[in-house]
Amino acid sequence: MTFTKSVDQTTILQGDRSKLKDLLRLRLNACGWSDQVRLLCREAIKEQDSINCDALVQQVTPKARALIPDTVKKELLQKIKTILVQQEGIDI
């Protein structure tokens, strides 16, 4: 089993996955990331009038991921580590 699958299963079983997603959404909105991604989408649509949704996502995703602040990434990773440590403590 890969580390990613283990994290997914643990967070789903504990009900923490939705909490993590909510935290991520909150932090990304607070730092203006959502607005930046919205602007990237608008620019891509202006450049290519007939772009479909899949192509838009494919074009914008790498840029959007690069715009995520390191502080948000670090906070989320710390929360995941905390959840995994707590889970390990419960299993012992």
Curated annotation (Swiss-Prot):
PANTHER family reported in the protein's UniProt record: ENHANCER OF YELLOW 2 TRANSCRIPTION FACTOR (PTHR12514)
The name this protein goes by in its record: Enhancer of yellow 2 transcription factor
GO cellular component assignments: DUBm complex; nuclear pore; nucleoplasm; SAGA complex; transcription export complex 2
One GO BP annotation of this record: protein transport
Highest taxon listed in the record's lineage: Eukaryota
Keywords assigned: Activator, Chromatin regulator, mRNA transport, Nucleus, Protein transport, Transcription, Transcription regulation, Translocation, Transport
Function: Involved in mRNA export coupled transcription activation by association with both the TREX-2 and the SAGA complexes. The transcription regulatory histone acetylation (HAT) complex SAGA is a multiprotein complex that activates transcription by remodeling chromatin and mediating histone acetylation and deubiquitination. Within the SAGA complex, participates in a subcomplex that specifically deubiquitinates histones. The SAGA complex is recruited to specific gene promoters by activators, where it is required for transcription.
